[in-house]
Amino acid sequence: MKRTLLGPVKTVLLLLLLTANGMVLAAPAVAGTAAEIDQEVGVALVKLHAAAPAAIELTKVAKGILVFPNVIKAGLVIGGQYGEGALLVEGKTVAYYNTIAASYGLQAGAQSFGYAMFLMTNEAMDYLNKSEGWEVGVGPSVVVMDEGMAKSLTSSTAKEDIYAFIFGQKGLMAGIGLQGSKITKITPGQ
């Protein structure tokens, strides 16, 4: 009797696909109105500040904070992610944005996460405001914070253009990256 690995591989892929499908369907709907986005952004910042005290310090000195409270990422060989958020200046929403990314390669699953980008310089704010769509990794330098880096960061040691914090990760998919994500200004629904 000849045995192959194809059967177990198909089973694992099917389980991953079903799990990913269930997670995407169970995930909260992408916010569509300004009020919904504002509410989700407020909740996300409270959670981020509780999880990463360094974010509180950056909030005090950042020129602007771009917050995407719920980004959905899913894929099976070909993947994508999408989320909507707001740019805050001095605690008030001044514009709305979406984040979109596509990927391909060895991947299977789905996850949701949020991220906040602290724009520390006028140049970073100008770049965001003047671009027709900003691809992360092109333009101002972005430092994605991990726990170790966040512990040593203070408002006086923050010298980069943009600091990003990823938070609230849920799901079954390896890795989160912001590189290549395109951020574009939107007009949310009423």
Residue ranges and their predicted role:
Residues A27-Q190:
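Small-residue-enriched, tightly packed secondary-structure blocks
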